[in-house]
Swiss-Prot record:
It catalyses: (R)-pantothenate + ATP = (R)-4'-phosphopantothenate + ADP + H(+). This is Pantothenate kinase. It comes from the Bacteria. Its EC number is 2.7.1.33. Keywords: ATP-binding, Coenzyme A biosynthesis, Cytoplasm, Kinase, Nucleotide-binding, Transferase. InterPro entries: P-loop_NTPase, PanK, PRK/URK. One of its GO terms (cellular component) is cytoplasm. Belongs to the prokaryotic pantothenate kinase family. Pathway: Cofactor biosynthesis; coenzyme A biosynthesis; CoA from (R)-pantothenate: step 1/5. Its main location: cytoplasm.
Length: 316
């Protein structure tokens, strides 16, 4: 790819290099595609139709880039170890994935986990979502915060920071709480155990937030490479409503579902309800707390109408 062209030169006054879909695809080079259609299907979200072409075009160049960063980090760590004369515990490389509800963060995280684990080094790649660090439903109800679920105030951030501090210190068998979307709550006495992986992918709404830098340690302080998955709010709202309609016919009909009362809504009622939830909760959270963190990411993936990434921005 010719990086002397006008598109590249226009990036000179910004903190990011911008790539069209076609330009980014060229950076795949010779990275092989290790996923099949059969492998891809279970990685997709309920409202996403992501093709192998998207994996080739967007995710293979990204995996190539991340592996360069990991190799560079390993080399720097080896230099430090020789200087200090120490043989420290293995420290995982942490990748965070942020973005709005319904943008496809979870799908991106699962695809990256699969691709990175199949790299020739056969690295161990774990995936944790920050949903597990939401306060329990009873506490949110007690504190009158149910309408703020997903907002920064609804997370046990101190617990999440301790979890990441343990991971980064090389501690083995670190436990993370498990969240169930079915019951809309933390699952009692159930944990995911992270045991010294080579890479940890952390996926969540607010993983790029920093708040008041003078007084706290933040999730972003532990992250080595951060990704923000972006789309226009009109698209996000439409995707959220479409997903809500599909849940109405599937997960909401489960008698154990917290949202089982939505299963009886007519389609117009469901569309109206989903739109109201977006306007009052998810859209508000996006504008107030999530979108303002976008420019802190190392990489921004901007999606278009069909969920395909149209623009990639890489921090210089």
């Amino acid at each position: 790819m010719d990086l002397t062209n006008s598109t590249f030169l226009s990036n000179q006054l910004t903190p990011f290099l911008s790539f069209s879909r076609e330009q980014w695809a060229e950076l795949r080079k010779s990275v092989p595609l290790t996923l099949t259609e059969q492998d891809l299907k279970p990685l997709l979200g309920i409202n996403e139709e992501l093709s192998l072409d998207e994996v080739r075009t967007i995710y293979l160049p990204l995996v190539r880039l991340i592996n360069y960063y990991i190799e560079e980090r390993i080399q720097r760590q080896q230099v430090m170890n020789r200087f200090l004369g120490v043989n420290p515990d293995k420290v995982p490389y942490i990748i965070s994935i942020a973005g709005s509800v319904a943008v496809g963060k979870s799908t991106s995280a699962r695809i990256l986990q699969s691709l990175l684990s199949q790299w020739p080094e056969r690295r161990k790649v774990d995936l944790i979502t920050t949903d597990g660090f939401l306060y329990p439903l009873a506490k949110l109800q007690q504190d009158n915060l149910l309408h703020k679920k997903g907002f920064p105030v609804s997370y046990d951030t101190a617990r999440l920071v301790r979890f990441l501090a343990d991971i980064k210190s090389g501690k083995p068998k670190v436990s993370a709480p498990v969240y169930s979307h079915l019951i809309y709550d933390i699952v009692p006495d159930q944990f995911d155990v992270v045991d010294q992986p080579d890479i940890l992918i952390l996926e969540g709404l607010n993983v790029l937030q920093t708040g008041d830098r003078s007084s706290q340690t933040f999730v972003s302080d532990f992250v080595d490479f951060s990704i923000y998955v972006d789309a226009d709010e009109d698209l996000l709202k439409a995707w959220y409503i479409s997903r809500f309609l599909k849940f109405r016919q599937s997960a909401f009909s489960d008698p154990n579902s917290y949202f089982k009362h939505y299963a009886t809504l007519s389609e117009p009622e469901a569309i109206s309800t989903a739109g109201r939830i977006w306007d009052e909760i998810n859209g508000l959270n996006l504008r107030e707390n999530i979108l303002p963190t976008r420019e802190r990411a190392n990489l921004i993936l901007t999606k278009g109408t069909d969920h395909a990434v149209e623009l990639v921005k890489l921090r210089k």
